[in-house]
């Protein structure tokens, strides 16, 4: 963590699952300060108390700022003296955003513009924006708003001066707040059938630790305007549900199919065909550099570029699909799953 030695890191939306994992990983390093910027004072108070109890020797490194990414001034006020930002604040529930799309616009698009405007004005060194696979070929309000969030970030990077701006894009983060596995476990423990939208639906899966790894990789290796993704595996929702049933004593014959919700797709895409054309393979990651052409297109009519990669699209159907035992093994790596199993 030498890059963070003595530095001040700010996490927008920092009381969520991502922020908690960052704190657990960073607090006992040589980082100087971590600022949690969010609008929910109750969650901030709960987080403050939790870390004072669990990690009292380093809890004073955490500073809490109540504010909203929708408010530019509160962003600026919280950023005085900040070196780096992980921008995680977002509305991310697909059905909710379908019913309230303008709220997604205010938080995911305008909020991101505010964060980046404030970061550039305050001389922040680097901002990593967290995005989602739903931003690729978006069909729902949440995905469309996150796609525009990425566009805002890339546009800002062209005029960001010393501030490096990168985006990360990833799929379903297992056991994060609002995700499906905790719901299934609760349903099993209550003696109810577990509800599945569509068994044949596929989704990328990764752990919260891997989500943080991706952000740190982007921070260390990304260039201004880059989009970075991790080569995540995927699984079918039906097989994942069966795995949870077998791990927690549920009856897989009681799985109840309820149908696809508002705005959902049968599979998700991490890299579109167009992005694959210029993607750089970095082993466990792909990097998509920003299109740094200007608005003067005359020269491009004369001097084209026919080079492109063989990869045509990276989605949850053509990545590595995990079998049931592999799904179980991946879930068993999670502290949350270990804790829920220990309840019995």
Put a short name on every predicted segment:
Residues 7-29:
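N-terminal Rossmann NAD(P)H-binding glycine-rich loop of SDR-like oxidoreductase domains
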Residues 121, 151-344:
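Strand-loop microenvironment adjacent to phosphate/nucleotide-handling motifs in alpha/beta enzyme folds
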Residues 38, 65-66, 106, 198, ...:
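Conserved residues in the N-terminal Rossmann fold of short-chain dehydrogenase/reductase
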Residues 63-84:
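Conserved Rossmann-fold cofactor-binding substructure of NAD(P)-dependent oxidoreductases
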Residues 12, 79-88, 129:
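Rossmann-fold scaffold of SDR-type NAD(P)-dependent oxidoreductases
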Residues 30-43:
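Conserved glycine-rich Rossmann-like NAD(P)H-binding loop of the short-chain dehydrogenase/reductase
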Residues 87, 91-150, 155, 165:
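Conserved Rossmann-fold NAD(P)-dependent oxidoreductase catalytic core, especially the SDR/UDP-sugar
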Residues 40, 50, 133, 233:
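Residues in the short beta-alpha loop(s) of Rossmann-like NAD(P)-binding domains
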